Amino acid sequence: LIHALLGAVPEQFHWILELAGLQGAASLGLSEMDEVLNANNFKMYENEVLFLLSFLQINLNNNSELCQKYLNKIGEGYKENILLNFTAARLLHNLGQNDFCLKVLENRPSSESTFPFYYLDYLQGMSYMYKLDYDNAKQKFEYFINNFKGKNYIKSTYHKLAWITYLRGTEDNYFNSITNEGNASIDEDKVALRDAERNYITHNRLLRARLLYDGGYYEDALLEISSFKVVGKNSMYFDEYWYRSGRIKLELDYDDSEVINNFEKSYNIGKSTANYYAPMSALQIGLIYEKQNDFSKAESY
C-alpha cells in the first residue's frame, strides 16, 4: 500500500520523497497487494485488500481486466458486506455496467444491521440518472438530503435535482439550495456551486447524452447526441457537443480519424474559453496518438 501511494505522488514532489529516503511505484505496490489478496495466510484481510486494490486500480492504473478480476473475486459478497457492496458498485460504474451496478446497490445489506451508509443512496440516485429514470433518482436524492448529516455531496445532490426539473421541463429553483447548503470541498460540489453561480445548465440533449454515456449506454448516447442541431442558436454548446461526440464514438470503436476530427473541432472552438472541453479534447487526441505509437504527435497535444 505504501509503495502504491508513494508511486502516486506527482513528479514535481519526488524531491521530497528523495529527501526522506523514500521511493515507491504504483505498479509495484499494486502487484504486491495482489499477491496478498491471493495468499492464504492473509485470507482474514481479503475484504479490506479487495477494497483497497479496487480503488487504487480505478484511480491509478484503471486496468479494466483487473477491475473485472476484482469484481469476480467479490462475487455475491456484495449482498452480505457493505464495504464490498460499495466496492462492487464503483468497479461496475468504472466498467460502464450501470444495470449491474444498480442491481448491486438495490441488493445491499440492510442498514438495520450496519451503520448507515447514505452515500450509497447518492450513488443509487446517480445510477437511476444514468438510465434517465428521473422519478427513482429524485426519490433517492431526496432521501440522501433528508438523512445525511454531513456536508459533502449536498451541493452535488441539489445540482442533480436541478437537472431533473430542467430535463422534465418543470420549474424549481434548486440553485438557491446549491448556494446555501453543504460545502464545496470536493470536485462534485465545486462544479455544482460554479454552475449555480452562473445559473447554467447545458443543452438538454447534451445533458442526456452525457448521462447515458456515464452509464455505459453508448448507443443510446449516440442516438441522443445525434438529435442535437449544430446550428447558430446552439453555438455556445459546440465545444461540448464535439467533445461528447468524440468520447461516445471512441467507446463505440469508430475510426480514429473521425474521433480525432471531433476532438479537434472541440479544441479549436473551445480553446479560448474557460470550459474544460478543449484541454480534455487535446488530452484524448494525445492518448489516441500514444496508442498508435506516434509519440511526437502525442506529446504535442
Report residues per predicted region.
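Residue-level detector of the short coil/turn that links helix A to helix B
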Residues: 24, 61-62, 96, 132, ...
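TPR/TPR-like (Sel1-like) alpha-helical repeat modules
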Residues: 21-38, 138-149, 155-187, 264-267, ...
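Solenoid-like repeat scaffolds
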Residues: 18-23, 37-42, 71-80, 106-116, ...
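"A position-specific structural signal for the A-helix of alpha-solenoid helical repeats
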Residues: 1-5, 52, 87, 119-126, ...
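Short coil/linker segments at helix-helix boundaries
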Residues: 1-59, 65-73
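Residue at a conserved register position within TPR or TPR-like alpha-solenoid repeats
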Residues: 3, 57-59, 92, 128, ...
